[in-house]
Structures are given as structure tokens and as C-alpha cells.
Amino acid sequence: MFWRLRSKDWSYANTAAVREGFHRLVDQDLDPAPGLLAYRDGRAVGWVSVAPRDDYERLTNSRVRPKIDDTPVWSIVCFVVSKAERGQGLTSKLLDAAMAYAVEHGARGLEAYPVDAGDGRVPAALGYTGLLSTFEAAGFEVVHQIDSPQSKVRRVIVRRAAALE
């Protein structure tokens, strides 16, 4: 929900309101859906949020993550992977599924906002947008360096054409 709310609206939201908003969003049975779930043995173990960039209020109004050009891109804004599944490649599988889903729904370009871990590890609380290395392995290229003094990690904007090889 973070990406679907303006900064000032997020600052006033409490956990219950965010959870309720998320449930309302999912219950709308939207097409396209607001994201994709990964299941193992009938249990949800991962999530990726993917939608047209304009669906994300925070991006529409962002000075930190500016609109690069007029290409109508789909944005991949966050991943959630259960602790038991981390380190097993699920984020890459979710990314592949998100790219395919966006293409199926007419995306011409894909955009994301990962962190660059460099040689180190990134805490899950900071790496929820994905790691640069994961996106680079999927054919994305850095198109913008995000300069944010309050960020504890290097963040970038990456893009790739939507056509999948």
C-alpha cells in the first residue's frame, strides 16, 4: 500500500488502515490484479506488486523517483518473501512472473526501483524493492541514480523493454 498512497497520506495511516486498504484493493478483483502471489504447498510464500506506473500514487507525485520519459511503463515496486523461502531464488521467480504478467497485459516497458547491495547484504526492511543484481540478471539497465540523503542504501531506477526473449 506504501506505493499506492501519497507520502502525506501514508504518514497518517496506521497498520489497521493499511491492512484494510490492502484487503479492499485485493477484494476488488481488478484486472490487471495489483500483484502476484507465489505458493508452496498451498501456502502463500511470496508477493510481487506490479502494475502500470500511473497506478502508484507515490510514483506519480515523486520528486525522488522521477518519471524518466513518456513511455507507458509498468512498475515493479515491491517483493515480500517469507523468511523460510529467502535465499532460494524466489524473488527472481516472482520477477519473471511479474514481467510475463505485465507483457500479457500490454506493457511496453518495465521499470523498478531496486537497491544496490554492492558487495554487502541489505536488511529485508531496506531491500523490499528488490536488489539491483536480480534486475540486471533479468535484463534491466540502470537509467537513473536516486539521490536521497535519508536513504541508507544506494537506490536506482532500472528499465527494460517489455518484450521477453
Predicted regions mapped to residue ranges:
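Active-site rim helix/loop that mediates acceptor-substrate recognition in acyltransferases
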Residues: F2-G35, R40
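Conserved acyl-donor/pantetheine-binding loop and adjacent beta-alpha core of acyl/acetyltransferases
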Residues: L25, Y39, R43-V80, V122-L132
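Short beta-strand micro-motifs in enzyme catalytic cores
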Residues: P34-L36, P72-W74, K152-V158
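Short, well-ordered beta-strand micro-motif
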Residues: L37-Y39, S49, I157-A161
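Conserved acetyl-CoA-binding loop-helix of GNAT-fold acetyltransferases
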Residues: C78-V81, G87-E104
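Conserved GNAT acetyl-CoA-binding A-motif
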Residues: L95, A102-L126
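C-terminal "cap" of GNAT-fold acetyltransferases
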Residues: A125-A138, H144-E165
